[in-house]
């Protein structure tokens, strides 16, 4: 993508962002990002998080999903969040800053989880987009593979998984992998997800491995 096209695309995104209904609603409700509404919509349909549950939130910054998760899990629940970017503290959220593709960060995250298994793994991770599908799609698929691997390491039997996936090369194969690990897998496109985005969310329940 040329610099000129990238600048035009960035300007269009900024205009859409500030005109966006969900951006304005997030600001009104004190939510850190419009992404919070995606998890709220998923929760309304699939009831993933309940009081007292332990939740891992991957790609958490700036904290929209963690805000929703900690409210749903309640005082007796636990939310462990991780992102390569910094995130302002949220009461009830144990946040680890680091790139969990790196072994030392992954080990630190597993230490936070401890010996007990978790009930829900959330992933809203996305790579820094270059504008080239040949570069961006493999990066995105690598992240969702890591999120599924996290499920294999920490998720309790019958646990749940919600992950953002970009449709493209590797998408169908990934769905097959998720279906092998969970009893039920649904594809969701929340209303708050921009229509032109290739992102969808796989919502998997009944972890069975």
Curated annotation (Swiss-Prot):
Keyword Protease tagged: no
EC number(s) recorded for this UniProt protein: 2.1.1.166
Reactions that this protein is recorded to catalyse: uridine(2552) in 23S rRNA + S-adenosyl-L-methionine = 2'-O-methyluridine(2552) in 23S rRNA + S-adenosyl-L-homocysteine + H(+)
Lineage of the organism: Bacteria, Pseudomonadati, Pseudomonadota, Gammaproteobacteria, Alteromonadales
Keywords, alphabetical: Cytoplasm, Methyltransferase, rRNA processing, S-adenosyl-L-methionine, Transferase
Record: residues binding S-adenosyl-L-methionine: 63, 65, 83, 99, 124
Family of this protein: Belongs to the class I-like SAM-binding methyltransferase superfamily. RNA methyltransferase RlmE family.
The name this protein goes by in its record: Ribosomal RNA large subunit methyltransferase E
Gene expressing this chain: rlmE
